[in-house]
Each structure stands twice: as structure tokens, then as C-alpha cells.
Design a protein with these regions (language model features):
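Terminal amphipathic alpha-helical/low-complexity segments used for targeting or macromolecular assembly
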Residues: 1-51, 175-186
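Structural signal for interior beta-strand "rungs" in well-ordered beta-sheet cores
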Residues: 54-170, 174
């Protein structure tokens, strides 16, 4: 994670600077500790640690989320990563990115099902730019780029570029939405 931050930010001058001054790095360190505790069954301490990280950095990562290595959050403020999100290796997020739920699964008598998969899967080598909102149990394919301020509720295949301008003034039937909003990279 530290190496990803250093190599991913041209303004970074040293590992010490990143460890001491980058809220994204602070949030990821807290997440790694909280996630380990969560996996060991110490869920309340894990949630407390993630709450401290959120209060300190403005970045909200649920300790149950699964995040691969070499992960970098640049600028960070307002990033939200939900409980069942899965993030691959070498993923980079910018400020105000949300990996959230679109709807909640209900069981008997309308009671919400705890822990049901409802957050995105982000595959390896993906970059998600500032203000993007990605909702639901969808997949962002390997090597994709999600542009700033994109609102995305459908999966996109590997190598896609999804840009906010493609979303503007677009009226399509839901089954044709993916064709209207993504453009595979060549």
C-alpha cells in the first residue's frame, strides 16, 4: 500500500511523508488492522478502529470489506467503501468515491438480511476518479477506468472507460445501458 501511494502520487517525496501526512494511507493502515480483527471475530473493536479512522481522515471503510494489496486512496476525503465490497490488487481511488449498496435484501417479514452481498466488486488494476458513485453488487472489470462524477449501477467488462460525459443527456432502456455508458479501451 505504501509503495502504491509513493509510486501513484507524483507529489510524494518520501515514505515518511506518506505515512505521516496522507489521510488515505492512514485510513488504509487502520483498515488493515480493523479487517484482521474483524476476521478474527473481534467485530466491535474492528468497528471502533474504523470509526476512529473515519473521524480522523473522513474516509469510511467498513472492516468487513475485502481489499487487495497495493491499494491507494489519493486525497481521500469522502471515500466510502461498504461492508461487502471486494477490491482487487493495484486499485486506486480518488476523493468522494462511493462503493455502496443499491438496495437491501429482505428476508421474512421484511427484515433486512445481514451481510448479504450488496456492494461492488472492483477487479485488479482499476482506477476510480473523484466523485464516482458505484452502487450494487456489480463488477468493475479488470483494468477499467471510471471517470469523475460517474453514477454507475451496472457491471462493466474488463478494460472499460466509463466517462461522465457519456452519461449526460442519455436516455436508454435499462437493458441497453451498458452499451451506452462504456467504451472498451483499445
Amino acid at each position: 500500500d505504501l509503495q502504491a501511494a509513493y509510486q501513484g502520487d507524483p507529489a510524494a517525496t518520501s515514505a515518511s511523508e506518506i505515512l505521516l501526512c496522507y489521510p488515505g494511507m492512514t485510513a488504509v493502515i487502520y483498515y488493515r488492522v480493523a479487517h484482521a480483527l474483524y476476521e478474527l471475530g473481534a467485530r466491535l473493536p474492528a468497528r471502533l478502529i474504523s470509526d476512529i479512522a473515519h473521524s480522523t481522515t473522513g474516509i469510511d471503510i467498513h472492516p468487513a470489506a475485502t481489499i487487495g494489496g497495493y491499494f491507494f486512496i489519493d486525497h481521500g476525503t469522502g471515500v466510502v467503501i461498504g461492508e461487502t465490497a471486494v477490491i482487487g490488487e493495484r486499485v486506486r481511488l480518488y476523493q468522494a468515491v462511493t462503493l455502496g449498496a443499491k438496495r437491501f435484501q429482505e428476508g421474512e417479514k421484511g427484515i433486512l438480511v445481514k451481510g448479504a452481498p450488496r456492494h461492488p466488486i472492483v477487479e485488479d488494476d482499476v482506477v476510480i476518479y473523484a466523485g464516482a458513485t458505484i452502487l450494487g453488487r456489480i463488477t468493475i472489470g479488470k483494468g477499467s477506468i471510471i471517470g469523475g462524477n460517474v453514477w454507475l449501477t451496472h457491471s462493466v467488462p474488463a478494460g472499460s472507460n466509463v466517462l461522465q460525459a457519456q452519461m449526460r443527456n442519455t436516455t436508454v432502456e435499462p437493458k441497453h445501458l451498458i452499451d451506452a455508458v462504456y467504451q472498451p479501451r483499445i
